[in-house]
A protein has these predicted regions:
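Acidic catalytic/metal-coordinating carboxylates
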Residues: 37-40, 63-69
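C-terminal output helix
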Residues: 111-123
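Alpha4 helix (beta4-alpha4-beta5 surface) of REC/receiver domains from two-component response regulators
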Residues: 66, 89-108, 121
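Active-site beta3 strand of CheY-like receiver
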Residues: 48-54, 59
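Two-component/phosphorelay signaling modules centered on CheY-like receiver
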Residues: 15-33, 126
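Residue-level signal for the "D+5" position in two-component response regulator receiver
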Residues: 34, 59-62
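Hydrophobic/aromatic residues positioned on beta-strands within the core alpha/beta folds
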Residues: 85-86
Length: 129
């Protein structure tokens, strides 16, 4: 089976996290683009048309849910799968978090820190579709 490189946009305000995720995805053979703010994520998604967006819940300027909802309303980006990344905390209301992400149009939600085999499986699911 031939592995063709896909374009993935990582939208996260944490430089260190973006760097770690970028390295992991590049190791899988894919091309990575990055955005640190909600507006930057929208602009890059519209210009590069990635095959997948890894979207943090909290971005400067707007939430990941708001960015996702805007992308899903846009004709040119509505079919790009979005995986919401949320930090796992004991104070987190898991059901509410999942509900908000899915209502915004996200296909999936992953909690940080990622379990790497799960992250790899999610990436493969959306990149092979």
């Amino acid at each position: 089976m031939q592995n063709t490189a896909k374009k993935i946009l990582i939208a996260d305000s944490n430089d260190a996290f973006r760097g770690s995720l970028r390295a992991f995805i590049q190791e899988m053979g894919h091309e990575v683009f990055e955005a640190a703010t909600g507006q930057e994520a929208i602009e890059k998604a519209c210009s590069i048309h990635p095959q997948l967006i890894m979207m943090d819940v909290r971005l400067a300027g707007m939430t990941g849910d708001e960015v996702t909802a805007r992308l899903k309303r846009n004709q040119s980006t509505r079919n790009i799968p979005v995986v919401i990344n949320a930090a796992w905390t004991m104070a987190c209301n898991v059901e509410e978090r999942i509900h908000r992400a899915l209502n915004a149009g996200a296909e999936e939600i992953l909690y940080k820190p990622f379990h790497l085999p799960m992250l790899r499986a999610v990436l493969r699911t959306y990149l092979l579709a």
